[in-house]
Swiss-Prot record:
Keyword Cell membrane: no
Record's catalysed reaction(s): tRNA(Gln) + L-glutamine + ATP = L-glutaminyl-tRNA(Gln) + AMP + diphosphate
GO annotation, cellular component aspect: aminoacyl-tRNA synthetase multienzyme complex; cytosol
Segments of skewed composition (Basic and acidic residues): 181-198
Ligase recorded as keyword: yes
Protein name (database record): Probable glutamine--tRNA ligase
InterPro entries: aa-tRNA-synth_I_CS, Gln-tRNA-synth, Gln-tRNA-synth_Ib_RNA-bd_2, Gln-tRNA-synth_Ib_RNA-bd_N, Gln-tRNA-synth_Ib_RNA-bd_N_1, Gln-tRNA-synth_Ib_RNA-bd_N_2, Gln/Glu-tRNA_Ligase, Glu/Gln-tRNA-synth
Gene: qars-1
Amino acid sequence: MATKEELLSLGLSDSKVAETLKNVKLTETIGSIVKLASESGEISKQKGTLLYQLATKLKPQVAAHTPLVVKYIMNDGIKTEPQLSAAIEYLLSHTVKGIQVPDFEKSCGVGVVVTIDDIEAAVTKVIGQHREKIVAERYSFPAGKLLGELRALLPWADGAITKKEVDLRFLELLGPKTAEDLAPKKKEKKPEGPKPSKDAAAAATAPGTKNQKEASPEEFADGAETMDELLRTRAHFHKVGENFKQDGYVTTPKTAELLKAHVAAVGGKVVTRFPPEPNGVLHIGHAKAININFGYAKAMGGVCNLRFDDTNPEKEEEKFFSAIEDIVHWLGYDPARVTHSSDNFQQLYLWAVKLIQKGLAFVCHQKVEEMRGFEVQLSPWRERPIEENIQLFEDMKNGKFDEGEATLRLKLTLEEGKVDPVAYRIKYVPHHRTGNQWCIYPTYDYTHCLCDSIENITHSLCTKEFQSRRSSYYWLCNALDIYCPVQWEYGRLNVNYTVVSKRKILKLITTKTVNDWDDPRLFTLTALRRRGIPSEAINRFVAKLGLTMSQMVIDPHVLDATVRDYLNIHAPRTMAVLEGLKLTIENFSELNLPSSVDVPDFPSDPTDPRKHSVSVDREIFIEKSDYKPDDSDKSFRRLTPKQAVGLKHIGLVLRFVKEVKDAEGHVTEVVVKAEKLSEKDKPKAFIHWVAKPVSCEVRLYDRLFKSKNPEDAQLVPGGFLSDINPDSLTVVYNALIDQSIAKSKVYDRFQFERIGFFCVDRDSTSSTLVFNRTVMLKDGGASGKN
């Protein structure tokens, strides 16, 4: 541990010393470095700065070479920060291959002397290349661009001296800064939001945080329009075979040999995997996982496997296997291979025996309650003889223990403090693929990393909650002397006003709150597809969120906005009436109108030739809300006894003649007179309508829950089932659609003019179509207009 005096001897300020002393690990590293350096002589301020930088940049993989770097700093072989960075990079790149001193010296410029004359000449050359632009832009010219070019020319030059020379040349060329130079530059106004998140590489090593942040559309600045763009430009992961360069990666004497075989096996290409549990359908959070795993492999020219983590036979059903694979294809991805953790049960068992033989695993008889938590007593069976553990594990395999009577545990402590995680447990449940062959099943923590190794996964990409298991991931692979992939983490995606827990969704189904896993009010991917949300919109939504370590909580309207943007371009427009009111045009025969008119499918794009034919008739239907029997509401802009209204697409203006009422006094029909639209007397509004319509059923979906977080015990003390929105579904049984869409197929999508975007549901029959509302229009649709 470095003392205050030792830190001061490095030339640090009092405030920097105080800050450093708070970091115990860094202080310990500095202490050992100062001790090594002191053996070589007095520490000057320049050397002290380099020694401090060494302590902050040093990674565990190269810690053994600390004496070598200290030696070169103290004998003036390494004099600048660029040299130090190059030295550390060389050591990191040669963690596995080993270092050669001549190569090391060459890589970090040992013995290279950069004189003032060299710096002046390089600055003259670089400024000369940009002179015209510098003169034009004056001090607004980005000096960083010049410094970058100078670093390329003179990588070992002192950065401070180089910067001083550039500043001097600017002064000579441009003279002192004028008032205009000093005036603050106007910046383009950007929407306020949080600072862009760090890229995934930085995120993987960032300290953990339990904070979730709510995201809004303005926070898409760190994302991209497509997953390909996002993963090419933001995902700075390791190169295939350079696993050892990553923080926390543990190397062994066999690492070089294993990595060489691994690179050969994958042909130098990226291999990822998406490993869902087949005990439920996928939800919106899985869309992010699918896109990152499949998307990264695709962007890098590699492949991605779909691996079912089928290690818990109690909860797995065949329907979930097919549903998951179907959704992966729906999102636009094709797995290179479909694999199962159960494919490897025999190998996993043999490795468990090997761990026991190495004294790294033991059979334990503690109950779950005794093992649960962080401050637990070590198992009294932790140090039982290896031979006894082997026999007991064999007895577990052969069905000689009851469920819960014995487990196999690993001898390690996780980052979060949990001790000796369980590797195998007993379950007398037939497995859907292996039948009754096994009664012991491996846990996720044991299976996950080993299956990654078997499949030669290059990048094990997972959500942040697995960060605390990274050490056990590396420990297991290295304990068995097998190839060890690199685990990277990213922030999980959650959505407000819903639940995604499989257990809670099942509760919603069993209580008949929702109909099934694909009920359009849920945020499972099958439900979103059924609601009419396109896979392309989901992929774009995920891409726009970017790569971040933060756990994001998204409001549903953020997804809706992305969906709306997509459908506005891809969903053809049509007219439909939800609650119809019959209008009879009394002078229809005088108008000499055609029996039908052509209406563009995409009127916002005049170059798009697609169109559909709409019937024209004496009797038409409009929305009840588009007519008011009195004129008291001055803000109302549509049909009243004293106010005309226009019909979209047909160039007619309707004027009130009379109402027709039933015996109870309800208006059942309005008789109107029509006239051709003219420039003189334009109505205040134009409304949609249908003629000779077809009846259908329309389902209007809203949020399933009233609260943002229905799982919050403080906000919803009665539990999530007490928070159900009673108006989450409204069914319109006699809606009217135009004949042009009467033959639509399941999943066909349309924009019902002035109402919203709708999709044909699978409940449709040959006689009655059923439409689900996908999203409303931005303005709330016809009901929100005056």
